[in-house]
From Swiss-Prot:
Entry's Gene Ontology molecular function annotations: DNA binding; DNA-directed RNA polymerase activity; protein dimerization activity
The protein's assembly and partners: Homodimer. The RNAP catalytic core consists of 2 alpha, 1 beta, 1 beta' and 1 omega subunit. When a sigma factor is associated with the core the holoenzyme is formed, which can initiate transcription.
Coiled-coil spans in chain: none
Protein name: DNA-directed RNA polymerase subunit alpha
Keyword Protease in annotation: no
Signal peptide interval: none
Organism: Pseudomonas fluorescens (strain Pf0-1)
């Protein structure tokens, strides 16, 4: 077969060697020289960081107030239990979030099989050990399982609801990716007289919730979708439409002095660079209470004055500050 020097080779041979139910080696050849590392590295990064899956994101354990606690009759401390929960391989069918319960007492090993499951929840590794109980031990907990992608630290899920969250609900850093290990090597390949070609060998292991071959297929699809925009790239760019800012309530552009607060409260706000009413309403009560010399009495005064104007703390303004609001104005407010 004669190939033009300007024509790129495309892989014609794909081999899948199943090592175990959760591990496989995928071989792709032939590739032009250098394309083995180009494709291998791109697929590896997608498999590690962008694959969707399910994981425990929150745990509530009876008698536990924080992760540094110890439970009587339980061999592991709370931190070890939380680490073990991260090893659960869970599949949700048709749901994005679910709450599961686990309850066990008496001497023995607590495993994933002890979790009470709904009909649309599946645990792939039921033998996974969560804790070990003594004869006087008992473990009761609620687990929140959610669907996500890649790795998500607990603090990235914090929201306004955190202030009302009951004590003892422990947030977990979650790895949603079903991929446990991914490595690739590039070997030499030959087509007729050409001996400088690449052969890509990907060694992939998952947690069992996703078949390794399907994981590669999904990663390749993600890469294809991201590159599709370049395929249709046109030289003539479309005119940019400049959207006008949404009209802002004029009262938000007025200085906080117009609220006629006490001198103490007004000075505290200015010390925190809060010059306009629009600046003030975006602050929360917790943030204001952290302001030096601003106590609960001043906070109550601020809330009452805002309420009389139909405003409140903790509001969100998408287009603040507006372009018409000059920094120089703040300096003279």
């Amino acid at each position: 077969m004669q190939i033009s020097v300007n024509e790129f080779l495309t892989p014609r041979h794909i081999d899948v060697q199943v090592v175990s139910p959760t591990r496989a080696k995928i071989t792709l050849e032939p590739l032009e020289r250098g394309f083995g590392h180009t494709l291998g590295n791109a697929l590896r990064r997608i498999l590690l960081s962008s694959m969707p899956g399910c994981a425990v994101v929150e745990a509530e354990i009876d008698g536990v107030l924080h992760e540094y606690s110890a439970i009587e009759g339980v061999q592991e401390d709370v931190i070890e239990i939380l680490l073990n929960l991260k090893g659960l391989a869970i599949k949700l069918h048709g749901r994005d979030e679910v709450t599961l319960t686990l309850s066990k007492k008496g001497s023995g090993v607590v495993t994933a099989a002890d979790i009470q499951l709904d009909h649309d929840v599946e645990i792939v590794n039921p033998d996974h050990v969560i804790a070990n109980l003594a004869s006087n031990g008992a473990l009761n907990m609620k687990l929140t399982v959610a669907r996500g992608r890649g790795y998500e630290p607990a603090d990235s899920r914090q929201s306004d609801e955190d202030e009302s969250r009951s004590i003892g609900r422990l947030q977990l850093d979650s790895s949603f990716s079903p991929v446990r290990r991914i490595a690739y090597v590039v070997e030499n390949a030959r087509v007729e007289q050409r001996t400088n070609l690449d052969k890509l060998v990907i060694d992939l292991e998952t947690n069992g919730t996703l078949d390794p071959e399907e994981a590669i297929r999904r990663a390749a699809t993600i890469l294809q979708q991201q590159l599709a925009a370049f395929v249709d790239l046109k030289g003539d760019s479309e005119p940019v439409v400049v959207e006008q800012e949404d009209e802002i309530d004029p009262i938000l552009l007025r200085p906080v002095d117009d609220l006629e607060l006490t001198v103490r409260s007004a000075n505290c706000l200015k010390a925190e660079n809060i010059y306009y009413i629009g600046d003030l309403i975006q602050r929360t009560e917790v943030e204001l209470l952290k302001t030096p010399n601003l106590g609960k009495k001043s906070l109550t005064e601020i809330k009452d004055v805002l309420a009389s104007r139909g405003l409140s703390l903790g509001m969100r303004l998408d287009n603040w500050p507006p372009a018409s609001l000059k920094k120089d104005d703040k300096a003279t407010a």
